[in-house]
């Protein structure tokens, strides 16, 4: 949202832009409201208190506050035990300052799960102060959702999916599995932060997700609910400064997400970097989670025939159901987006799959849950085989 020369205020879609900076989980929003004593869960009320470290380059402060100098690094060193204490407070109080601090951690992270963020500096974890941004997000396990689906191994699941996506050659946010006390977390390196060339301060890099780019509120992030789908995002990427590369990358990501049964690839899980002069380009992938470990029938399982992708592919009709999608639907969807070589993209992904699996298997640490690894690798193999058979049909 560039500043208008006339200083005329934005209306309508501006609320959606700011709503997308916040967690899209009502319970988390209500806990933030209670923690800071704001009158509502309205985005502007919440961001007036927690907007000091938003996704991208934004810093939002109360009207009477001046931002401290951004070109310096100020922080408090944390022990492993203190990080564990901070994590223990995150579930009950997602933005607690923790320890002996009277100052809450005023960060805003989008998404639906419990998480916090810290600064990693010279190998030590630190609580940023002043205008110093966080550099890493610490994501806790999702646990059991209201439908009884057990996502307690989401940390391992997301780590493995990231390794697989990286193996296919797609850029993806770097992540590791770390343990602090009783808490296992996925530590994700923020790609909207960069150390300055003189190594004296951390830069915030402007970015926005595709809900923000389209003026869509987070409640409508799925295409079936009115959010952007493949066709709309591919149209927007025509304007990317590296349009051919980004459009091919996005379509490859869609196929790989289907292979992984990564069914939550909605518009908030794809973003663009905002560059000087009004340019933009696609960011790395992030938040990739496979449904294979919870597929099945009965309580606490997702029936494969009912699973839906976040974005539709096209044939004579739109297809969301994971089980119904075939290679021809990807080819037709790409054709509508002006990409003629989708068949070769699919063939490349299929051919690469065995090598990707072998590499990911070699990276698995000791104690990694067999259910996650076996179900994801078996599912990936089966889906690649299906695509191969689809391409062989006349």
Kindly label every feature range from the protein language model.
Residues 1-394:
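Phosphate/dinucleotide-binding and metal-coordinating scaffold of catalytic cores
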């Amino acid at each position: 949202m560039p500043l208008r020369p006339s200083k005329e205020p934005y209306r309508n879609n501006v609320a959606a832009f700011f709503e997308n900076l916040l967690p899209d989980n009502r319970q988390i929003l209500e806990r933030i409201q209670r923690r800071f004593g704001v009158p509502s869960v309205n985005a502007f009320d919440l961001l007036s208190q927690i907007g000091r470290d938003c996704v991208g380059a934004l810093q939002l402060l109360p009207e009477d506050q001046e931002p401290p100098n951004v070109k310096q690094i100020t922080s408090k060193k944390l022990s492993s035990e203190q990080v564990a204490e901070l994590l223990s407070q995150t579930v009950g109080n997602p933005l607690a300052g923790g320890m002996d601090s009277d100052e809450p951690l005023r960060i805003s992270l989008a998404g639906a799960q419990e998480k916090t963020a810290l600064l990693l500096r010279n190998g030590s974890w630190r609580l940023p102060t002043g205008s110093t941004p966080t550099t890493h997000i610490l994501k806790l396990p999702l646990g059991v959702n209201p439908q009884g689906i057990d996502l307690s191994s989401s940390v391992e699941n997301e780590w493995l999916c990231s390794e697989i996506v990286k193996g296919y050659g797609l850029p993806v946010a770097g992540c590791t599995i770390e343990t602090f006390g009783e808490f296992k977390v996925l530590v994700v390196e923020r790609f909207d932060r960069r150390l300055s060339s003189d190594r004296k301060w951390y830069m915030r890099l402007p970015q926005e997700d595709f809900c923000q780019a389209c003026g869509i509120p987070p409640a409508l992030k799925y295409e079936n609910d009115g959010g952007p789908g493949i066709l709309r995002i591919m149209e927007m990427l025509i304007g990317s400064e590296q349009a051919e590369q980004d459009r091919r990358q996005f379509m490859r990501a869609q196929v790989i997400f289907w292979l992984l049964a990564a069914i939550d690839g909605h518009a908030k899980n794809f973003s663009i970097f905002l560059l000087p002069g009004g340019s933009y380009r696609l960011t790395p992938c992030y938040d990739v989670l496979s449904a294979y470990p919870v597929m099945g029938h009965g309580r606490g399982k997702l029936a494969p025939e009912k699973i839906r992708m976040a974005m539709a592919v096209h044939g004579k009709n739109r297809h969301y159901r994971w089980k119904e999608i075939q290679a021809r639907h990807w080819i037709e969807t790409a054709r509508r987006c002006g990409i003629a070589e989708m068949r070769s993209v699919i063939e490349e992904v299929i051919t690469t799959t065995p090598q990707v699996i072998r590499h990911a298997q070699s990276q698995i640490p000791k104690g990694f849950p067999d259910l996650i690894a076996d179900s994801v690798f078996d599912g990936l193999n089966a889906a690649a085989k299906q695509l191969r058979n689809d391409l062989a049909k006349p």
